């Protein structure tokens, strides 16, 4: 299994747009956008000169299967947030989350030299919460009725892991290093 992260380029925008509008992908996202190529291009260009975000396409054996990002990169306070989705749902359940989780932790703490990695997850997305907890992230709080979507309010948990914690536990996990462009 060869997994790699390649920088998003303009040729990826139509595929990202397709993934981003799938109900099974947006179910646990804050928005359900009706995207166009015009809005995709605008988003893409907004990321190009923005040092506080990084976006990659997730490739599995050369096939583009999803998107991963680091955002809110704060070098002063040494923290950032992250998120990802597997847009091609036929690739879910293959251990990809393990590789992404461990390698992003290494990238954030070793390459970017940050101290904390955060994320926000719908409380109903128990599978993802469990994955984050498995690799050392802890729930730091709950944002009550934080997202209004499809006529309902949803609670969100905030999660985080620090550099020290990851350094202390990473030896317990066996994972291959992946190429991050």
Regions found by a protein language model. Give the residues of each.
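Short, hydrophobic secondary-structure boundary micro-motifs
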Residues: 27-29, 56, 169
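Juxtamembrane/interface motifs at transmembrane-helix termini
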Residues: 35-38, 47-49, 86-87, 175-176
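A short helix-loop-beta-strand connector motif used in the catalytic cores of GNAT acetyltransferases and
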Residues: 45-57, 66
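Hydrophobic pocket/interface hotspot
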Residues: 16-17, 25, 40, 82
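Acyl-donor (CoA/ACP) binding surface of acyl/acetyltransferases
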Residues: 2-15, 61-181
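Conserved GNAT-fold acetyl-CoA-binding loop/helix
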Residues: 24-42
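Structural motif
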Residues: 23-24, 51, 112, 136
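Residues forming the ATP-binding cleft of Hanks-type serine/threonine protein kinase domains
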Residues: 20
């Amino acid at each position: 299994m060869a997994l790699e992260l390649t920088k998003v380029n303009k040729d990826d925008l139509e595929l990202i747009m397709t993934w981003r509008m799938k109900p099974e992908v947006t179910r646990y996202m804050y928005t359900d956008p009706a995207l166009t190529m015009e809005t995709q291009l605008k988003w893409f260009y907004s990321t190009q000169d923005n040092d506080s975000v990084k976006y990659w396409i997730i490739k599995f054996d050369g096939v583009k299967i999803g998107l991963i990002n680091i955002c809110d990169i704060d070098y002063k306070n040494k923290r950032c947030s992250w998120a990802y989705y597997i847009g091609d749902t036929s690739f879910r359940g293959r251990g990809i989350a393990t590789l992404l989780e461990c390698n992003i932790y290494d990238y954030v703490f070793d390459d970017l030299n940050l101290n904390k990695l955060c994320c926000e997850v719908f409380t109903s997305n128990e599978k993802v919460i469990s994955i984050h907890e498995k690799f050392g992230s802890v729930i730091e709080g709950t944002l009550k009725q934080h997202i209004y979507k499809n006529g309902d309010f949803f609670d969100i948990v905030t999660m985080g892991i620090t550099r020290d914690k990851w350094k202390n536990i990473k030896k317990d996990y066996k994972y291959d290093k992946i190429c991050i462009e």
